[in-house]
């Protein structure tokens, strides 16, 4: 049986001018997932940049398999940086990082149940949330309400998205991870 995918969107799904500021409560959520999930049953999925919550995950989830979706035209420097982090790399068909949500939708949402933690981003992560909502298999979506674009998207998908609270998110997220 395949591992259960947990997508962490929070660093790669921005334009170059936006810097993800990590919040301690969401880093604590990631810590809890690392502590309570089984590395033999869960795989984490991130984007191509080594920033924000995705970087936090890479620094702390050493026992887990982590897949990084990268655009088809990734620079050699970024590719080497990802390889040094010991992640598995999936090359998306899209040439830019703003379009990799399409490959995540195809590779994950159309093939497996999953969990999406949308912690930061712009239109690309909003599109990822929409794709998760339209998934062939169940994708439980959790959104950071402090990110204005994500909060607006969550409000438009009322009933399909869970807004993360400032604390006590761990058990709510863990009950949807099939591992």
Listing of model-derived features with the role each one plays in the protein:
Residues 2, 10-166:
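Acidic/glycine-enriched connector segments
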Residues 1-3, 179:
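N-terminal intrinsically disordered, low-complexity tails enriched in polar/charged
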